[in-house]
Amino acid sequence: MSRVAKNPVKLPAGVEIKLAGQQLSIKGAKGALELKVHPSVEVIQDSGELRFAARNGDQQTRAMAGTTRALVNNMVVGVSQGFERKLQLVGVGYKAQAKGQVLSLSLGFSHPVDYELPAGIVAETPSQTDILIKGIDKQLVGQVAAEIRDFRPPEPYKGKGVRYADEVVRRKEAKKK
C-alpha cells in the first residue's frame, strides 16, 4: 500500500493557495493552476504546507488522496520552477524551428509539419535538431512532447526520428542473407 498522501506538500515562498470548497487554486511566479479536488479527499492547510486525508478508509478513497497529493505537488513545482522536456531530431535533413506558437518541423515527409502549441506551452529551438518544451502544467508539457514525438518516432534500424533527450532507442541488426 502506498503512503504518498501521508507526506505533506511544502509550499515554497511566493506560492499562494486558495481553497474554495473543492476548488484548489495555486498561484506562483510562473503562473496559476486550478484543480477540482475529489469530494472524498479532504485538504488541510497548515502553516507553509498542505496535507491530504481520505474522508473514509476504503482503498479507492485512500488512492484518490495519494493521487491528489501528487497532482498538487506537481502544480506547486510547476508554478514555482516550471517543467521542461527536451527532444532531439536524429536524421539527415531533420530540423525544427519555433515561430511564436507554431513549431515547424522537417521530418523527411514531402511537406513540413506545423504543430500549433497549446496555450501555456513555449517551445524553444537552441539548435535545429533540439527542441525544448516548457510550461507550468506537467501533464500538458509531457502531452505536447509525446505528440511531437509521434510525428516520427525513432525507428529501430538506424535510430532516425524524434526522441526524448534521455531516451535509449533499442537497435536491431539488419537482416542477413
Swiss-Prot record:
GO biological processes: cytoplasmic translation
UniProt-listed InterPro entries: Ribosomal_uL6-like, Ribosomal_uL6-like_a/b-dom_sf, Ribosomal_uL6_a/b-dom, Ribosomal_uL6_bac-type, Ribosomal_uL6_CS
Keyword Cytoplasm: no
One GO location term (cellular component): cytosolic large ribosomal subunit
Keyword set, alphabetical order: Ribonucleoprotein, Ribosomal protein, RNA-binding, rRNA-binding
Any GO molecular function: structural constituent of ribosome
Job description of the protein: This protein binds to the 23S rRNA, and is important in its secondary structure. It is located near the subunit interface in the base of the L7/L12 stalk, and near the tRNA binding site of the peptidyltransferase center.
Family membership noted in the UniProt record: Belongs to the universal ribosomal protein uL6 family.
Assembly notes: Part of the 50S ribosomal subunit.
Protein name: Large ribosomal subunit protein uL6
